[in-house]
């Protein structure tokens, strides 16, 4: 019986009888019996091979079979048999040996794109039975399509076979299925696209030109774990292409990806990490990831990691991916600082011995790769001065030498292999070496107390004292963490009690001047001064940033140069600080150098270390102070000097920013002094502007009388100063507008639900229009304001005219039967004639004429009343027309995506009816107000360019879009789509 069924099925598949219903019914019965009883196990290999060949040639790759429009059950059984047979790789090889890939795609996939565009008008309907019918009736055809996709997925088993399918444009057809709501179909489609793009550059390029990235980013927030993994995996593969990375950035994909880092799933986190690592190759995206808190999220994921019970290999790969992302972020010096502030050195160091905490039977070859990746991040962080000090404390000498020899900004992972093996051997010999990392833990308990402050970490030390990071002792009633401050400790030794007290008094008086007077954003703020245990303590703001010296060293190690715009931004801020010190406070800093100029994380310049500052008196200062290579000729020659000493140091700092080396440098002190006195230095490179050259030359004038003061310096930089202030004003205006818009958006609108006219007039169009409601624009609701002229003797009144109101019909009584008294009597109202004396000088008298049949008025003086409900419905109709699913296009269209995101937000759960009405009325009025929604764009410039809209800065990001611009996009989409018209 078994052999008989198999033989009959083999014979049935060897031929095809067009239009024979009985033949189709018999084959369906044979297929059902064969599958349910699993008869393929009873056939010999030759019969199975023949069965597979007939199935391929005469069914799934046969155009005549498909054009006969077989029944759904028949197609389902055919693909179920194919799915069963293709579990064996030899039968998959049989399919590829037949070489009918093109026929398979054409028969089952090619016409899918035509069917989804307009399957009713398509003459060639070979896929209507499986594709177009599925899109129209997903539930009925779901299982059939899943089997078809599963078979296709099995056939894409290597790169060569994947490229054969790509040559037949299989990805274009599968892409359309991403519009389905059936999760199984969606996941199989994503898997197929991932396999094709992973093995084919052509496929990646084709998908980048489609809306694939947009679809994936929209599926991620609401999808399950498997869907999220498939979407992120596809994005990771496509991110090899620059076009894909640009699309992800434009579609605001970076925040979406960062939000997935906190999900405890190793494979998902691995995909996210490598996707972000590729995006972070662009400097701006790297900074954006850091600004969005990405560095903190990464360290939270790798600090105190707990190995899973199974799939440890995936877990190790995830840690490697996250450290690779950190390595890419560490290419930016500002990110190095954030990583150091996040206790990154300690967290990464403890991760080096994670292998000792894992017990597993799995053979994991990626431990060495993880250690190499960790050392690469630490080496990139080493270029930051703070991290350099910490790493010197913990790395053994023999390893530290190899560590330094790798070189700065070396991202080649294999160069760290020897270091990783050496350190791993040290751990094997003595696990106690890992305790050394506790000394660089900046989150440990306070190391001591001084007064009301807890000492957290030592920032630096010198001959006269130390500088600590401190915080106020926690208050029992306070839940907020204490603000971090800097505490400067000054030793007072070798003094008797009387001298010590006097010195304390003198020093406190000197610093009190600074504390009480200096209030400037570019100058460090001193908070408190106190004495304890024969030591002077100065509390000041902790500058979260790095010094100009660190920036110069980092840039020199990168073998690059600062952008001139950035140099001017720092120069202007330093000028503002010096003007404040010299002209308002009469203070000379006397030790202005790159080490004392800090750059915060938001690129604000802060001048610090006023230990040598002096307040100017009537006489010139005479004491020697400062670092000699930044000292002016007057100080070197021990001559009186004034505020222009700071101008000289200012010029030295600017020169060093440009050339990345001090303006005067020599190992011989006498030679160095001669260079300073004679102002002999190497000229600037030709790459710098004439303005910068002239500024440095003027500041480094050896004759103090020829050297300008800070006001003249500002005059030399007038144009640059105005450009900087213009940028600051623009940023403040943008921030202010955004805050104001957000505040107004959050205010609850108090209005009656039944009143549609009450708030219509509160949104005015920029201009008048004579278009009717069909245009989607609102006319002004309130009539023109009327003026009541007084009838005083001093005015010549104008002759009045009779005002006739339209007759009020009985419709009023029908609409409001409960209020008959509100119906006015029909009469003619006439204004008082001005030919008679007025009874009042401040009012207009109305005179009632005899009762007549009704009131009449000319129709041409009436203003047409427009139903606001129709206006709102018109906007809804326009939005639905351009986002109609029957007009699905797989091509990338920024405008359509914008409208779809607006519709999604408008109809979301967070919007109530009042907010929906407000948004639609603003859209109808083409309001210039910005839309306060997350529309999924980090930059709207591609949308505006595609819509040919002007009026924005083309060289700056456009992070918000107005209702007026959205309306223009909708009009463009309607104009481009004949069906929408």
Swiss-Prot record:
Residues 453-725 form the Protein kinase domain. InterPro entries: ARM-like, ARM-type_fold, Armadillo, Kinase-like_dom_sf, NEK_Ser/Thr_kinase, Prot_kinase_dom, Protein_kinase_ATP_BS, Ser/Thr_kinase_AS. Keywords: ATP-binding, Kinase, Magnesium, Metal-binding, Nucleotide-binding, Serine/threonine-protein kinase, Transferase. The keyword Endoplasmic reticulum does not apply. ATP binds at residues 459-467, 488. Residues 735-802, 823-847 are annotated as: Disordered. The active site is at residue 591. This is Serine/threonine-protein kinase D1044.8.
């Amino acid at each position: 019986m078994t052999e008989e069924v198999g033989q009959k099925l083999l014979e049935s598949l060897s031929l095809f009888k067009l239009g024979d219903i009985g033949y189709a019914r018999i084959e369906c019965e044979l297929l059902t019996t064969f599958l349910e009883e699993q008869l393929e196990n009873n056939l010999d290999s030759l019969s199975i091979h023949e069965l597979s060949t007939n199935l391929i040639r005469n069914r799934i790759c046969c155009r005549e079979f498909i054009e006969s429009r077989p029944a759904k059950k028949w197609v389902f059984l055919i693909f179920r048999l194919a799915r069963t047979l293709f579990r064996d790789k030899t039968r998959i090889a049989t399919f590829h040996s037949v070489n009918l890939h093109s026929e398979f795609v054409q028969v089952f996939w090619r016409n899918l794109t035509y069917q989804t565009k307009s399957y009713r008008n398509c003459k060639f309907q070979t896929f209507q039975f499986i594709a177009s019918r599925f899109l129209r009736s997903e539930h009925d055809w779901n299982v059939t399509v899943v089997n078809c996709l599963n078979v296709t997925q099995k056939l894409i088993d290597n790169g060569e076979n994947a490229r054969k399918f790509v040559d037949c444009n299989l990805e274009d057809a599968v892409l359309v299925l991403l519009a389905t709501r059936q999760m199984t179909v969606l996941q199989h489609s994503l898997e197929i696209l991932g396999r094709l793009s992973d093995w084919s550059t052509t496929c990646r390029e084709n998908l980048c030109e489609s809306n694939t990235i947009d679809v994936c980013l929209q599926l991620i927030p609401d999808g399950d774990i498997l869907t999220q993994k498939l979407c992120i995996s596809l994005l990771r593969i496509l991110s090899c292409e620059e076009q894909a990375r640009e699309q992800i950035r434009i579609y605001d994909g970076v925040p979406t990806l960062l939000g997935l880092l906190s999900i405890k799933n190793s494979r998902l986190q691995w995909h996210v990490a490598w996707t972000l690592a590729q995006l972070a190759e662009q400097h701006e995206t790297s900074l954006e990831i850091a600004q969005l808190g990405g560095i903190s999220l990464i360290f939270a994921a790798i600090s105190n990691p707990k190995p899973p019970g199974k799939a440890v290999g995936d877990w190790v790969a995830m840690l490697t991916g996250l450290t690779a992302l950190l390595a890419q972020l560490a290419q930016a010096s500002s990110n190095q600082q954030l990583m150091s502030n996040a206790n990154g050195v300690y967290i990464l160091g403890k991760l080096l011995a994670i292998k000792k905490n894992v017990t597993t039977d799995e053979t994991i070859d990626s431990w060495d790769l993880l250690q190499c990746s960790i050392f690469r991040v630490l080496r990139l962080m080493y270029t930051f001065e703070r991290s350099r000090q910490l790493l010197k404390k913990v790395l053994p000498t023999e390893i530290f030498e190899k560590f330094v020899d790798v070189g700065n900004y070396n991202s080649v992972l294999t160069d760290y292999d020897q270091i990783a093996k050496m350190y791993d051997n040290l751990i094997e010999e003595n696990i106690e070496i890992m305790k050394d990392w506790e000394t660089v833990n900046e989150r440990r308990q306070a190391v001591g107390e001084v007064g009301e402050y807890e000492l957290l970490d030592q920032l630096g030390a010198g001959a006269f004292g130390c500088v600590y990071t401190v915080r106020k002792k926690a208050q029992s009633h306070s839940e907020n963490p204490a603000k971090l401050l800097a505490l400067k400790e000054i030793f007072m030794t070798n003094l008797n009690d009387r001298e010590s007290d006097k010195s304390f008094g003198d020093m406190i008086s000197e610093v009190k001047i600074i504390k009480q007077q200096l209030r400037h954003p570019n100058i460090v703020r001193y908070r408190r001064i106190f004495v304890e245990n024969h030591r002077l303590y100065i509390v000041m703001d902790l500058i979260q940033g790095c010094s100009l010296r660190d920036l110069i060293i980092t840039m020199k190690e990168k073998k690059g140069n600062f952008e001139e715009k950035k140099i001017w931004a720092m120069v202007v801020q330093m000028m503002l600080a010096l003007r404040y010190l010299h002209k308002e406070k009469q203070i000379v800093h006397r030790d202005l150098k790159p080490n004392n100029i800090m750059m915060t994380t938001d690129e604000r310049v802060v001048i610090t270390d006023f230990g040598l500052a002096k307040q100017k008196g009537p006489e010139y200062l005479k004491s020697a102070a400062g670092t000699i290579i930044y000292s002016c000729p007057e100080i070197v020659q021990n001559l009186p000097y004034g505020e222009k000493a700071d101008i000289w140091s200012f010029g030295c700092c600017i020169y060093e920013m440009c050339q990345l080396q001090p303006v005067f440098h020599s190992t011989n002190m006498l030679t160095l002094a001669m260079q300073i006195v004679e102002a002999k230095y190497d000229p600037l490179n030709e790459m710098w502007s004439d303005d910068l050259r002239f500024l440095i030359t003027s500041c480094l004038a050896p004759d103090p009388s020829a050297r300008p003061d800070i006001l003249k310096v500002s005059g030399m930089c007038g144009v640059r100063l105005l450009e900087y202030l213009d940028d600051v004003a623009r940023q403040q205006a943008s921030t202010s507008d955004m805050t104001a818009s957000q505040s107004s958006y959050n205010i609850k609108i108090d209005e009656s639900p039944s009143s549609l006219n009450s708030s219509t007039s509160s949104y005015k169009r920029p201009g008048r229009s004579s278009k009717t409601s069909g245009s989607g624009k609102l006319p002004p609701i309130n009539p023109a304001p009327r003026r009541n002229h007084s009838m005083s003797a001093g005015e010549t009144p104008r002759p009045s005219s009779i005002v006739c109101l339209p007759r009020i019909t009985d419709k009023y009584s029908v609409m409001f039967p409960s209020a008959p008294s509100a119906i006015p009597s029909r009469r003619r109202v006439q204004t008082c004639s001005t030919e008679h004396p007025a009874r009042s000088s401040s009012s207009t008298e109305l005179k009632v004429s005899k009762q007549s049949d009704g009131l009449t008025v000319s129709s041409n003086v009436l203003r047409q009343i427009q139903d606001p409900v129709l206006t709102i419905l018109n906007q809804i109709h326009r939005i639905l027309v351009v986002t109609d699913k029957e007009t699905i296009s797989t091509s990338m269209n920024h405008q359509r995506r914008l409208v779809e995101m607006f519709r999604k937000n408008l109809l979301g759960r967070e919007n109530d009816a009042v907010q929906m009405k407000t948004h639609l009325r603003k859209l109808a009025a083409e309001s210039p107000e910005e839309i306060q929604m997350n529309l999924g764009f980090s930059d709207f410039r591609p949308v505006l360019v595609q819509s040919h809209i002007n009026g924005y800065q083309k060289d700056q990001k456009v992070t918000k879009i107005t209702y007026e611009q959205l309306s223009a996009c909708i009009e463009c989409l309607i104009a481009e789509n004949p069906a929408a018209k």
